[in-house]
Curated annotation (Swiss-Prot):
Source organism of this protein record: Gallus gallus
DNA-binding region: 1-60
GO molecular function: DNA binding; DNA-binding transcription factor activity, RNA polymerase II-specific
KW Transcription regulation (keyword) present: yes
Keyword annotations: Developmental protein, DNA-binding, Homeobox, Nucleus, Transcription, Transcription regulation
GO CC list: nucleus
UniProt name for this protein: Homeobox protein Hox-D9
Gene that encodes it: HOXD9
Family: Belongs to the Abd-B homeobox family.
GTP-binding listed as a keyword: no
InterPro entries: HD, HD_metazoa, Homeobox_CS, Homeodomain-like_sf, HXA10/ABDB-like
Location in or out of the cell: Nucleus
Amino acid sequence: TRKKRCPYTKYQTLELEKEFLFNMYLTRDRRYEVARILNLTERQVKIWFQNRRMKMKKMS
C-alpha cells in the first residue's frame, strides 16, 4: 500500500535547498544523514534531489 502523499515542510524544503546549493549530488552517507536530520526517508531525499536537478536543467 502506498503512503499518503504529504508536502515537505518549509523547514525541510529550506534545508534541502541549502544542501543542494552546497552539493547537487549526495553521497549515500550524506543522504542518510540528511534524511535522519529532516525526519524523511532516504528515498524521499534521493527523489527530491533527482527532481531538483531536473528542475535546474529545465530552467537553464
